A protein has these predicted regions:
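Helix-loop-helix hairpins and the membrane-proximal interhelical loops
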Residues: 1-44, 171-244
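Helix-loop-helix junctions within the multi-pass membrane cores of secondary transporters/permeases
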Residues: 2-4, 10-29, 48-129, 241-329
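Residue-level signal for transmembrane alpha-helical positions in Major Facilitator Superfamily
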Residues: 23-24, 149, 225, 267, ...
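Predominant activation on well-ordered alpha-helical scaffold segments within soluble catalytic domains
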Residues: 29-33, 57, 78-82, 138, ...
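Short polybasic/polar patches that bind polyanions
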Residues: 34, 118, 235, 258, ...
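Short coil/loop linkers at secondary-structure junctions
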Residues: 38-39, 167, 239-240, 263, ...
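Residue-level signal for pocket-adjacent positions within structured domains
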Residues: 64-66, 111, 196, 201, ...
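Membrane-embedded alpha-helical modules
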Residues: 86-192, 293-388
Length: 388
């Protein structure tokens, strides 16, 4: 088989990962920036800086470790900012970014976060990943109601390609879905224009109130709801990399770019699973190339940061969510198998899975964190009971 034939799924996995990441949460970023009082031009500059920051970090880490290390912004953190920044000046918002990213960098330097991550059993990490991805898998079929032609054709294409040419199943699904959506008039091209926007430096301001009321919660949510699931995802996918160096790189870059609107650069979870799955490459040692491709697409998204919102508006949501769900089915099934394969850990794993899948938010912290907490409590109690 020609080497180029191996590159198609790899490049596509990187593209789908970036597409899903932006489609699922770019609007939240705009809401958070608007809440801080940023202008449309400044918001576009934030998207540019975020794309470049995530692209550089993904390329550097994946190349250095020869592992699929995908970075992302903190979607839970962005959601918290969108609801917390009203009444806070733009300068104070930048101060919050610098404060939180400095704390994240400190966690990497001290090794505190790495020590916490070593306490998570592999079965619970896999269960957490399956719980996080479950909703994406359900979306692949939920859109059959209301968008039967589009989603039905994509599912049919995926099934046929999976049976005949599994390496190209997502390629075929993307193309078939794109053709059907275009023919049905669901692709609204007049909403998309290419534009280049330079990020704008914003001088920070630090106030005790904003740092304590927004900065600290944002730091905790980012670490618990984004970085922790990100490392658990890598561990569940067979890439147990040391946490501290990755936190230092991502936290350091985020701190450097904070004055330009980069509120966080974290280890990705959901989108990383696309690049870490067998669909990206049959050889686990070659899947880092999918992350390299994703890094390239991140840079493109950054260069054309002002066009991202228009692109997301041009594509039908049903097409994006069905594509993402089908791309993640293999990861979901593999994670469930790893989570439930050990009978002694099965109860703790199912508690982790169901808590995570529930989507519950407590104290502003998402369900992935609470899934690991409750599952960890069950794991400790049941282990002690068995040894008694």
């Amino acid at each position: 088989m020609r080497p180029s034939s191996h590159l198609v799924p790899v490049v596509l996995a990187g593209f789908v990962a970036v597409l899903v990441g932006y489609a699922s949460s770019a609007a939240i970023i705009w809401q958070a920036a608007a809440a801080a009082g940023a202008s449309a031009h400044q918001i576009a500059g934030w998207m540019t800086a975020l794309g470049i920051g995530m692209g550089v970090s993904t390329l550097v880490l994946s190349w250095w470790y020869k592992a699929p290390v995908l970075t992302a912004w903190s979607t839970p953190g962005a959601a918290l900012l969108a609801t917390s920044l009203h009444g806070v000046t733009l300068a104070e918002t930048i101060g919050v970014f610098i404060f939180a990213n400095a704390l994240i960098l400190l966690c990497g330097i001290t090794g505190l976060f790495a020590r916490l991550m070593t306490l998570i059993p592999h079965s619970l990490a896999a269960a957490m990943l399956a719980g996080v991805l479950l909703q994406f898998g359900l979306h692949a079929f939920a859109h059959l109601e209301g968008h039967f032609l589009l989603c039905g054709s994509m599912i049919a294409a995926w099934l046929i390609a999976k049976a005949l040419a599994p390496r190209y199943a997502i390629v075929v699904t993307l193309l078939v879905g794109g053709i059907v959506a275009w023919a049905a008039g669901d692709v609204v091209t007049d909403k998309f224009t290419l534009s280049l926007v330079m990020p704008e430096f914003i001088a920070p301001a630090f106030t005790f109130t904003s740092l304590v009321s927004i900065g600290l919660p944002f730091f905790l949510v980012t670490m618990a709801s984004q970085n922790a699931p990100g490392f658990a995802t890598m561990k569940a996918s067979g890439y147990p990399l040391a946490a501290s160096p990755l936190i230092i790189v991502t936290g350091g870059l985020a701190l450097l770019f904070s004055p330009f609107g980069v509120f966080s650069i974290c280890i990705a979870a959901i989108t990383a699973a696309i690049c870490q799955s067998p669909d990206a490459h049959a050889d686990a040692d070659k899947r880092w190339l999918a992350a390299i491709a994703a890094g390239g697409f991140y840079l493109l998204a950054g260069i054309f940061g002002g066009s991202i919102t228009g692109l997301m508006a041009a594509l039908p949501l049903s097409w994006i969510q069905t594509l993402a769900g089908l791309a993640l089915l293999g990861t979901i099934s593999g994670s469930l198998y790893q989570a439930l394969s050990h009978e002694a850990e099965r109860d703790a794993a199912i508690v982790t899975f169901l808590t995570t899948a529930s989507g519950v938010t407590i104290l502003g912290i998402g369900s992935a964190f609470w899934g690991l907490v409750l599952g960890g409590v069950c794991y400790a109690l049941f282990s002690r009971a068995r040894s008694a």
